[in-house]
């Protein structure tokens, strides 16, 4: 989905990065909220490493988890600012940028940062 230019510009990010982010954040969520249900012995080197972090640094993991979401909120708000600066005025496109950036962070925001509207190209 994407319009090349204009007020309604939106481009979906890379499926590869969205998959990596979803799996990673899902695992992080699992480690923070349900660490007792993780089959550590079945995860190769990742298992003992995760178990060590959960056993010794669970507070840091939890705080880092909420910090990551807070950063995503900030990135999403910045995406709205960038939309306005780049002439993306369509409300639906702005909402899509906000949601995509909230869920996938810099993987989405980098696409918006790289976008140059016709208005910007002439300057």
UniProtKB/Swiss-Prot annotation:
GO cellular component terms listed in the entry, alphabetical order: membrane
InterPro entries from the UniProt entry: TMEM254
Keyword line: Membrane, Transmembrane, Transmembrane helix
Membrane topology label: Multi-pass membrane protein
Subcellular location: Membrane
Signal peptide start-end: none
Species of the source: Mus musculus (Mouse)
Protein name: Transmembrane protein 254
One Pfam family named in its UniProt record: TMEM254
Chain ranges passing through the membrane: 15-35, 63-83, 95-115
